[in-house]
């Protein structure tokens, strides 16, 4: 653990927005966080998701906290009626913020329900290290070729919104026409993935073409993208940005993605990726088939994605964040 990282007690998980949110709202956590802020002597404090009852919520009630900026990531559509009950509370407790950053327009639409009007706003995407992905060496065991293309999925298979069921259904269709295609799956939940293959009636031939890699390191994730013939992002909702798309594009991997608003924004309405109708496995399979059959199209998407990913490079994003800090300090 780097010396600049300070941990704060344990957390507990609750279901939230189709996933799990890990919160830390113990009394001791509040005391430790406030002490850390006071002892740090910071010029500015950058919070993430301060609307959640967790660590980033604590400094908002401090009378001696430094100027605060917050980044909002969540995208919830439609906005739940139950959360509207907390609007007045959140506007009061978020009032100490000077500036707010949204990772996308969809994140802004969600936060506008409770963000005080006097807070300055700016949309700045999540940042990635493009060179880290571009320079990664492909893994020969994962690398596809014209006779046996490799099609990748990365995500938690046990979360419906990550779209593994859509991916598996599309793979079943593609396997019938291209039995040599391989489907590489990285992420937690192999048991859930196996159950999904059972549910869609996958035969032995299809199962043999699936390879579950488990959770991968950052280095192996970059090699994963670099090794694929194409990467599929079949998420069904709850996404405010789509950082996996940006990472894959930075690696030069052709991307196929569901047409969520967030993914449309990242790919500039599909100019740097092949979009398919959300939750439609047949349309996803159609896109896979098109790219398998058209190497020139794959190369075109690879180049377009690589160019687009530069918009998310930290060398660009950090300057935008520093401008927000300057506003907060002025």
Regions found by a protein language model. Give the residues of each.
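A conserved mid-protein helix/loop that constitutes part of the nucleotide-sugar donor-binding site
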Residues: 158-173, 282
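Short hydrophobic beta-strand element within catalytic cores of glycosyltransferases
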Residues: 230, 254-257
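Short alpha-helical donor nucleotide-sugar binding micro-motif in glycosyltransferases
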Residues: 215-216, 223-228, 243
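Carbohydrate-associated surface elements
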Residues: 106, 127
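A short, well-ordered alpha-helix in the C-terminal region of glycosyltransferases
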Residues: 283, 297-311
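Conserved acidic donor-binding segment of nucleotide-sugar-dependent glycosyltransferases
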Residues: 269, 273-281, 290-296
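Membrane-proximal helix-turn-helix segments that form the acceptor-binding/catalytic region
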Residues: 83-100, 113-114
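Nucleotide-activated donor-binding/catalytic signature segment of Leloir-type glycosyltransferases, i.e.
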Residues: 195-216
């Amino acid at each position: 653990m780097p010396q600049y990282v300070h941990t704060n007690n344990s957390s507990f998980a609750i279901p939230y927005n189709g996933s799990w949110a890990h919160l830390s709202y113990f009394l001791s956590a509040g005391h430790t966080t406030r002490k850390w802020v006071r002892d740090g002597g910071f010029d500015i404090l950058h919070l993430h998701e301060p609307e959640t009852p967790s660590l980033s919520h604590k400094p908002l009630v401090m009378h001696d906290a430094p100027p605060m900026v917050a980044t909002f990531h969540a995208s919830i559509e439609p906005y739940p009626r139950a959360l509207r009950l907390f609007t007045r509370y959140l506007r009061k407790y978020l009032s100490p913020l000077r500036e707010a950053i949204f990772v996308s327009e969809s994140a802004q639409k969600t936060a506008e329900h409770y963000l005080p009007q006097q807070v300055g706003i700016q949309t700045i995407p999540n940042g990635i290290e493009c060179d880290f992905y571009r320079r990664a060496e492909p893994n020969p065991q994962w690398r596809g070729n014209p006779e046996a293309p490799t099609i990748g999925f990365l995500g938690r298979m046990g979360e419906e919104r990550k779209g593994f069921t859509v991916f598996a259904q599309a793979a079943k269709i593609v396997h019938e026409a291209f039995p040599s295609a391989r489907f590489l799956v990285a992420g937690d939940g192999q048991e859930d993935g196996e159950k999904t293959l059972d549910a869609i009636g996958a035969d032995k031939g299809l199962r043999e073409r699936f390879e579950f890699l488990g959770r991968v390191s950052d280095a192996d994730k970059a090699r994963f993208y670099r090794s694929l013939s194409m990467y599929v992002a079949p998420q069904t909702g709850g996404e405010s940005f789509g950082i996996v798309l940006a990472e894959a594009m930075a690696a030069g991997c052709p991307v196929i993605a569901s047409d969520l608003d967030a993914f449309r924004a990242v790919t500039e309405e599909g100019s740097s990726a092949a979009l398919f109708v959300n939750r439609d496995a047949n349309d996803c399979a159609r896109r896979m088939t098109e790219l398998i059959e058209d190497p020139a199209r794959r190369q075109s998407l690879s180049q377009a994605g690589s160019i687009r990913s530069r918009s998310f490079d930290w060398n660009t994003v950090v300057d935008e964040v520093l401008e927000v800090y300057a506003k907060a300090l002025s």
